[in-house]
Amino acid sequence: MAKNRFPGLGGGFNINQLQKQAKKIQEEIEKLQEELNQREIEATAGGGAVKVVINGKKEIKSIEISPEVVDPDDIETLQDLIVACVNEAIRKVEKMIEEEMQKVAGFGFTGLF
């Protein structure tokens, strides 16, 4: 009598079924990635003085700067606001991607994307 090599999986373990499920998850992830690439996320810094729009591919779509923060004598503050805003936008996109991928995969595949 053949011994069950995968006792934790039970006697009804079916590799073909597992492969079908993996393929289905992969297709769902690819579809979701396309959808996420089209989404746009907005982030602001300095109380809305700087606004960045970024898509799911982490491409900056636009940057808006309020004229009130443009001070030729203090370019450094404006630069800091832009950096903070871009970083916040990237963080938001990464969080969105992670949350959506977890819905599809149900576990930690997100490091792969």
Swiss-Prot record:
GO molecular function: DNA binding
A Gene Ontology term for the protein's cellular component: bacterial nucleoid
Compartments (UniProt record): Cytoplasm, Nucleoid
Stated family: Belongs to the YbaB/EbfC family.
Protein name: Nucleoid-associated protein Csac_1593
PANTHER family per the UniProt record, alphabetical: NUCLEOID-ASSOCIATED PROTEIN YBAB
Purpose of the protein: Binds to DNA and alters its conformation. May be involved in regulation of gene expression, nucleoid organization and DNA protection.
HAMAP family: DNA_YbaB_EbfC
Description of how the protein assembles with itself and partners: Homodimer.
Pfam families per UniProt: YbaB_DNA_bd
UniProt superkingdom: Bacteria
